[in-house]
């Protein structure tokens, strides 16, 4: 039997896609999972067990769509029992709750998963994938949802002498009265430092890149406040430090480690420092070793991710797709495809892309009257409750297409996919399209949000909307394959964009002008 779709990995992304395929019921599919449980990654990681994906059951709203803005852990489902907020009220949950949630999700959705089926090889013969996992499975399409499953190790002589994040001890008493170097400046490094501050005599964090704060960049993979206690101990002269520079070499003797640094911001070219322990917390990468030469995907970003098209397909292997954290290659350190609260929507979009491409199924759309009022009302209603555009800012869009008197509203379309492929159907050859996104201002990550001397535009002021730095709706009018006009809705402290004179009336006027061909 040749499957329509074979999914490798039963983590959050693999389960999300499987649940969509199961509910749709039109495709033969199977999920292969090497472990005995779904979501096995979370049984080990993060090592210190606290997730940094927020969980807020108490939102003041009974709208499940709106509430997903503050629920970063749930997968998409119509079953209210499968909301992660039912599992714990902790704002930063324990990873064991995620393991339990994913097991329940797999069981209650009835997805087809083969556990204990670790994939050892993938090849492609005459256009069909052959996947070896004890036995051989054949599939027309393969979706890789394995996550970043191998440690990313920088090229440092002697790095093999150090301890890895994956298997280092996490009991702080194991580091009592020791000097510790942590290589890395991401959340895993700071999470580790935070855990060891009470028992070590000194901790240094080292890396060539600047520490970037998530509250400034709006990228949730940058350093989160929940992990940044270490910064206090550094800047308040409490024994610890951050070393900005490159580790040149690591050696080890009976008394510990000697580490050679080349500093980025100091006068000395190199310096040697002594440590009792060296821990490597430099993140993870995609493991492409299972693919043979017939279908080995091209890699990108220091070979950490597969290179992908706007359809999350391998750039060099047709019909090989990716789902989950691997898809952050398309918006690396810019949006949220590296995280559940982002890629759950990307997986739903991928399912629609696959059905459109292989099943000749149009993107779901609601018909509207082709008037400024009708289109603006639909846009206003959506931007005030959508979680997808909220979480996947500047990456996913709602798209309203207009062909004469026929307007259609399409939800959650990848911006790059629409730009390249469009949404035309045999009965809807549109001339105009309105692409609706939520976006920050172009230099939002250059502004200190806590600096009261920084001038900001006033909220709810129509004439200043285009200068807004904070998240706000943007509507772009496309005609003839290019953007011909842009309209910004004024930012608002409560993220409500529905004031008649501030948001609604200007948007109606913009759409009407565009439909008349007058532009912006």
State the predicted function of each range:
Residues 20-78, 219-221:
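N-terminal FAD cofactor-binding segment of flavoenzymes
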Residues 76-82, 90:
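Low-complexity, highly charged intrinsically disordered N-terminal segments
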Residues 372:
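Acidic, metal-dependent phosphodiester-chemistry machinery of nucleic-acid enzymes
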Residues 1-35, 39-40, 87-365, 377, ...:
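Flavin (primarily FAD) cofactor-binding/catalytic cores of flavoenzymes
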């Amino acid at each position: 039997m040749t499957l329509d779709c074979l999914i490798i990995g039963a983590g959050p992304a693999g389960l999300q896609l499987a649940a969509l395929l199961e509910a749709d019921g039109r495709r033969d599919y199977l999920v292969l999972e090497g472990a005995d449980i779904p979501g096995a990654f979370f049984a080990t990681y993060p090592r210190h067990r606290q997730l940094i994906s927020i969980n807020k059951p108490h939102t003041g709203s009974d709208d499940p769509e709106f509430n997903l803005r503050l629920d970063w852990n749930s997968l998409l489902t119509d079953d209210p029992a499968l909301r992660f907020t039912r599992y714990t009220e902790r704002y930063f949950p324990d990873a064991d709750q995620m393991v339990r949630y994913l097991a329940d999700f797999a069981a209650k959705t009835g997805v087809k998963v083969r556990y204990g089926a670790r994939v050892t090889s993938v090849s492609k013969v005459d256009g069909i994938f052959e996947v070896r996992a004890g036995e051989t499975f054949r599939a027309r399409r393969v979706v890789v949802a394995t996550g970043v499953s191998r440690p990313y190790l920088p090229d440092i002589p002697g790095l093999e002498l150090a301890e890895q994040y994956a298997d280092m001890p996490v009991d702080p008493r194991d580091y009592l009265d020791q000097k510790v170097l942590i290589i890395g400046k991401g959340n895993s490094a700071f999470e580790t430092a935070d855990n060891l501050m009470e028992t070590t005599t000194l901790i240094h964090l080292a890396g060539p890149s600047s520490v970037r704060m998530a509250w400034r960049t709006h990228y949730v993979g940058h350093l989160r406040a929940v992990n940044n206690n270490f910064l206090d101990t550094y800047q308040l002269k409490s024994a610890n430090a951050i070393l900005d520079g490159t580790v040149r070499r690591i050696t080890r003797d009976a008394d510990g480690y000697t580490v050679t640094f080349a500093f980025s911001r100091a006068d000395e070219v190199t310096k040697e420092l002594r440590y009792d322990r060296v821990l490597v917390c430099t993140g993870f990468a995609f493991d492409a070793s299972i693919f043979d030469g017939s279908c080995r995907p091209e890699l990108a970003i220091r070979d950490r991710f597969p290179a992908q098209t706007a359809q999350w397909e391998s750039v060099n292997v047709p019909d090989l797709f990716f789902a989950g954290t691997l898809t952050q290659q398309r918006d690396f350190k810019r949006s949220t495809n590296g995280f559940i609260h982002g890629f759950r929507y990307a997986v739903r979009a991928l399912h629609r892309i696959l059905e459109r491409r292989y099943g000749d199924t149009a993107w779901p759309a609601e018909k509207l009257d082709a008037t400024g009022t009708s289109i603006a009302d639909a846009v206003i209603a959506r931007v005030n409750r959508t979680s997808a555009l909220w979480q996947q800012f500047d990456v996913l869009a709602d798209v309203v297409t207009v062909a004469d008197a026929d307007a259609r509203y399409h939800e959650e379309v990848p911006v790059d996919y629409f730009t390249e492929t469009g949404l035309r159907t045999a009965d809807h050859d549109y001339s105009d399209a309105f692409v609706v996104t939520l976006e920050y201002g172009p230099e939002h990550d250059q502004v200190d949000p806590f600096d009261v001397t920084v001038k900001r535009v006033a909220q709810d002021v129509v004439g200043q909307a285009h200068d807004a730095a904070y998240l706000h709706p943007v509507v772009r009018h496309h005609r003839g394959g290019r953007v011909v006009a842009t309209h910004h809705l004024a930012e608002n402290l409560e993220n409500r964009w529905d004031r008649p004179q501030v948001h609604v009336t200007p948007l109606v006027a913009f759409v009407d002008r565009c439909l008349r061909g007058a532009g912006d």
